[in-house]
Swiss-Prot record:
PANTHER family: ANTHRANILATE PHOSPHORIBOSYLTRANSFERASE. Anthranilate 1 binds at residue 85. It holds the Pfam family Glycos_trans_3N. This is Anthranilate phosphoribosyltransferase. Its cofactor is Mg(2+). Homodimer. It comes from Aromatoleum aromaticum (strain DSM 19018 / LMG 30748 / EbN1).
Length: 343
């Protein structure tokens, strides 16, 4: 079922839903550059104001997945993981989720990390990995080879979502969060079935979990720190939307549930990718402090999401062991060394 740009805009003005098949049509038009930048900006603003529905987000993510340059990774999916965030929490923390992937891979997860450069923070996943010497924009078969060899592959979002070029200028000029901010974590080009996803607003916890359910995901934890972080927080309770065995459960977790001391997260902020790199290396070198503790917490949740442990508590204990033993740092070094062969 097709819908014109004008009809879609009117629907948002009236605070009425754009139905799934209509949203498929609309997104295909937008991504093909068939709708003008002015109308694209108006429509995505209208969607934001009326609040995007689960059906609208699912349809938009489906189109982005259709158009993505995919990465095919053979082998079992049970421990195949992405750790990703929407960004936009305004905290400017170091790259917690990127640090977490090295702990997860050291535990035996296969990680297909999907991300880009910073939009709203001081250092995006691509920025800190580049600072570490990682080559961005590998071909799909090279990403797959890296996952097979090291347990980690990084998919640089612009290399896999070329159709986004048709909305890039609009997003940049608008400078506000739109539906595209929440689509990135839903559109992993390797179709990792297990995802630890941080979000920037509490309403998105249940929404993103239900979108992932409709998209056929296996095990997903969507998290929002009550202090505003799009991570599992050390400074407050964290809202969780968990998809497991086809069912969704929403609950809260607290650092002290797992024997972790609550710590303020203000001193986790960085001003640059180089600073984030230094913090990441400090964590993986087992330097004590809140940065290490928040990675242990998030990595524990990641191990649970990847079905490597039966509970978050066990995952946290395992994550601490992997950092203290040097296994997580060794995994980082292995990934960088393997990646250099493509330079």
């Amino acid at each position: 079922m097709t819908i014109t740009a004008q009809e879609a805009l009117q629907r948002t003005i009236d605070h009425r839903e754009i139905f799934y098949d209509e949203m498929l049509s609309l997104m295909r038009q937008i991504m093909a550059g068939e709708i003008s930048p002015l109308m694209t900006a108006a429509i995505i603003t209208g969607l934001r104001v009326k609040k995007e529905t689960i059906g609208e987000i699912t349809a938009a993510a489906t189109v982005m997945r259709e158009l993505a340059t995919k990465v095919t990774v053979p082998g079992p999916d049970r421990n195949f993981l992405d750790v990703v965030g929407t960004g936009g929490d305004g905290a400017n923390t170091f790259n917690i989720s990127t640090t977490t992937i090295f702990v997860a891979a050291a535990a035996g997860a296969r990680v297909a990390k999907h991300g880009g450069r910073s939009v709203s923070s001081k250092s995006g996943a691509a920025d800190v990995l580049e600072a570490l010497g990682v080559k961005l924009g590998l071909a799909p078969e090279q990403v797959a080879e890296s996952i097979e060899a090291t347990g980690i592959g990084f998919m640089y979002a612009p290399a896999h979502h070329s159709a986004m070029k048709n909305v890039a200028a609009v997003r940049r000029e608008m400078g506000v969060r739109t539906i595209f901010n929440i689509l990135g974590p839903l559109t992993n080009p390797a179709s990792a079935p297990n995802t630890l996803m941080g979000v920037f607003h509490p309403d998105l916890v249940g929404i993103q979990a239900r979108v992932m359910q409709r998209l056929g995901a296996n095990h997903v934890l969507v998290v929002y720190g009550m202090d505003g972080m799009d991570e599992v927080s050390l400074g407050a309770s964290t809202m969780v939307g968990e998809l497991k065995d086809g069912e969704i459960r929403e609950y809260q977790i607290h650092p002290e549930d797992f024997g972790l001391q609550m710590m303020g997260t203000r001193n986790l902020a960085v001003e640059s990718a180089e600073q984030s790199k230094a913090t990441l290396l400090g964590v993986l070198d087992n330097r004590p402090g809140p940065a290490r503790e928040i990675v242990i917490l998030n990595a524990g949740v990641a191990l649970y999401t990847a079905n490597l442990v039966d509970s978050i508590a066990v995952g946290i204990g395992r994550a601490r062991e992997l950092i203290e033993s040097g296994a997580a740092r060794a995994k980082l070094d292995e990934f960088i060394a393997f990646n250099r062969k493509f330079a």
